[in-house]
C-alpha cells in the first residue's frame, strides 16, 4: 500500500527540526518550555523515515542542547543517547507502521514520550546516580494533545 506524501519536503523538515533544536537552546531560562520543545523535537519533528542519519543527528543535537543548558544536570551524554534511541525508534515506526488515525498517533506520541522520559532517567542514573524528577514532565504530557495534533498533519499516512 502506497503512502501519501507528507506536506513538508525532506530539506524543509530538517530545517524545522533544527529550528526545534535552536528553540531548545533559546528557551534555557524556562526549563518547562525547554523540555516541551525538546520532546517535540525528538518525538515529532526529528523522526523522518526518509533519513535515519539526519533523524539521529537532530535528536542527539537536541539532547546535547538540553543537557548542556541545564545547570544542575550532569553532562555525560544520557539525554542525547536516550533522544537518539527514541527518535530512531519513532522513525522506524513511521516507516513500517504509518499512523492510520489521529487517536493512534496520539497514543504513539504518548508512548514515545514516556519512553523518552524513562530512558533519559535511566541513562542519567547510570551516568551520575539518582536525580530528583522534576514536574516539567507533567507539562509535556499535559500539552501532548496540542503538539501531537500539530505534528500529525505532516506524517505520511496510509491512503
Please place each PLM-identified region on the residue numbering:
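Terminal, non-globular segments
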Residues: 2-159
Amino acid at each position: 500500500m502506497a503512502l501519501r506524501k507528507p506536506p513538508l519536503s525532506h530539506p524543509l523538515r530538517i530545517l524545522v527540526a533544527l529550528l526545534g533544536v535552536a528553540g531548545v537552546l533559546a528557551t534555557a531560562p524556562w526549563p518547562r518550555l525547554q523540555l516541551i520543545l525538546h520532546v517535540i523535537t525528538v518525538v515529532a519533528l526529528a523522526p523522518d523515515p526518509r533519513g535515519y542519519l539526519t533523524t539521529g543527528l537532530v535528536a542527539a543535537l537536541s539532547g546535547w542542547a538540553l543537557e548542556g543548558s541545564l545547570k544542575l544536570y550532569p553532562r555525560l551524554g544520557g539525554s542525547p543517547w536516550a533522544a537518539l534511541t527514541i527518535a530512531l525508534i519513532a522513525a522506524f515506526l513511521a516507516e513500517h507502521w504509518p499512523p492510520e488515525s489521529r487517536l493512534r498517533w496520539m497514543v504513539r506520541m504518548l508512548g514515545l514520550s514516556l519512553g523518552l522520559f524513562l530512558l533519559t532517567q535511566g541513562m542519567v542514573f547510570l551516568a551520575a546516580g539518582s536525580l530528583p524528577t522534576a514536574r516539567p514532565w507533567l507539562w509535556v504530557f499535559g500539552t501532548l494533545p496540542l503538539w501531537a495534533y500539530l505534528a500529525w498533519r505532516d506524517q505520511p499516512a496510509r491512503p
